[in-house]
Amino acid sequence: MIRVCMYANRINGRYQEHYLTYERSLIRAGIPFETYIDGRPFKWENRVRWQLEMVRRNPSDHFVFTDAYDVLFVGTKNELLDAVFPHLLMFTTDRMNDDGNPWPQPHIRKHYDERREATSPWRFLNGSGPVGHGYAIASAIEFGLGEWEFPENGTDQAFWTQVYLSGWGDLDQDCNISQALWNMKDGEFGVKDGRFLNLITGSKPQFIHATGNMWPFIPLSLIPPTGAVSP
């Protein structure tokens, strides 16, 4: 079984509109999903610990953890299964800065170079969460929480970057699973037969991640008036 899981501390105002659009795109595709609303003040550590709770409860399932407000599902259920099932642990990716370095820690590029050769501009870990088998995700989180004390204002992106650079998992450099639009460039994306395409890697990403304030750049032409994504 595959589960798409989202964590939020509020769903109201414009966030509600964006979340409901995402929810409808998953329902239309028949993708099981679960959303957890945490009423506590937001902390990235809480999201990581919630992810650990989820995978411990269902260790044999496959998971895709995403943000709740700035994501759309634009693929199909079968394509998602094909993209996720071969991997024990995978991380979605961000595009490199214009200087070739990762945000927000440019000094760690050398560690990425040592970990794996870059195969596309989307070569650095995105903070939306892990993808893969429940048991593998649980093991990775337990490793990270056992190795480092989560900083008071630390992000899950920094946490998962440390986990990845310590040898856990792989990066979705081809953007087969998710496409982040941060630092997008002209000529990198297109739409063919109603499907969003990465013209650099040739992939048809299953998710589009607008990375926060980039929401207006999501190709809303993929969404009919009902809010569901086109088949």
Regions found by a protein language model. Give the residues of each.
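N-terminal anchoring/stem segment of glycosyltransferases
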Residues: 1-62, 86, 135
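Catalytic core and acceptor-binding pocket of nucleotide-sugar-dependent glycosyltransferases
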Residues: 122-229
